[in-house]
A protein has these predicted regions:
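A short glycine-rich, Lys/Arg-flanked "PGG" loop and its adjoining helix->strand segment in the class I
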Residues: 121-130
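Short N-terminal helix/helix-N-cap motif within the alpha/beta-hydrolase-1
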Residues: 71, 115-119, 146
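Conserved N-terminal segment of class I S-adenosyl-L-methionine
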Residues: 1-100, 104, 120-121, 136-141, ...
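Short glycine/proline- and charge-enriched loop/turn segments
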Residues: 10-12, 151-162
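Residue-level signal for the nucleotide or nucleotide-sugar donor/cofactor binding architecture
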Residues: 112-115, 171
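Conserved class I S-adenosyl-L-methionine
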Residues: 135-157
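A short beta-strand submotif of the Rossmann-like class I SAM-dependent methyltransferase core
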Residues: 104-110
């Protein structure tokens, strides 16, 4: 999302986004990070209030969180002083001196909020060292889940069309894979979180930057 179209709806809590569900997703993502090889330096792209960033810093990772939200970053800096935080819009990340130095870029529940989701992949690629890794989390959508929402009459509430802010894009595995590979990543592997198979709440994609 560009600076021209961004609106900060405000962070008011140090907790994970989306309550208990967000805690579970954050824990799942953190476990994935700890299992990756050759990862020391991490960028959390769209870090919000720093919930994930701070926990990875506590585990000993050299991590920087980037976000456009002043309210989120204020909480992050107060709660997690051991991590570094930078205010930047996604399209401005190419101006950061840290570009090209990260072993891993993570981004959890960010891409679905962007008018131009390709910018997130471009930023991740620019921030990563050659052959660096990407972990990207997003809400899962697929045929069976969408059908279940329609049959149970929950489509309107699910897509939150009357809310200020919220999700702008809705990704299936196929579409998210196409977007990620189109921007210079390969070896994609998906894992899932929440609910029964094919009705998953979230998906996490791991990929590697092409040299």
């Amino acid at each position: 999302m560009s600076s021209a179209s961004y609106q900060d709806f405000g962070w008011t809590s140090e907790g994970a986004a989306n309550g208990e569900s967000g805690v579970g997703l954050a824990q799942t993502l953190i476990k994935r990070v700890t299992r990756l090889e050759n990862v020391t330096r991490i960028c959390d792209l769209g870090c919000g209030n720093g919930y994930i960033t701070g926990r990875l810093a506590a585990l000993g990772f050299d991590i920087i969180g980037i976000d456009a939200s002043e309210s989120g970053l204020q909480i992050a800096r107060q709660q997690y002083p051991q991590a570094g935080f930078i205010k930047s819009f996604i399209e401005q990340t190419i101006e950061l001196p840290e570009a090209g130095t990260f072993d891993l870029v993570i981004s959890s529940d960010v891409i679905e909020h962007l008018y131009k989701p390709a910018q997130l992949l471009e930023a991740a690629r620019f921030l990563l060292r050659p052959n660096g890794q990407l972990l990207l989390g997003a809400p899962y959508h697929g045929y069976l889940k969408n059908l279940a929402l329609a049959l149970t009459g929950k489509l309107d509430s699910h897509f939150t069309v009357l809310h200020d802010g919220g999700h702008i894009k809705f990704f299936s595995v196929k579409i998210l894979s196409e977007l990620i590979t189109a921007h210079g990543f390969s070896d994609l592997q998906f894992s899932y979180y929440g609910r029964a198979p094919w009705l998953w709440k979230n998906m996490i994609c791991h990929g590697r930057k092409n040299d």
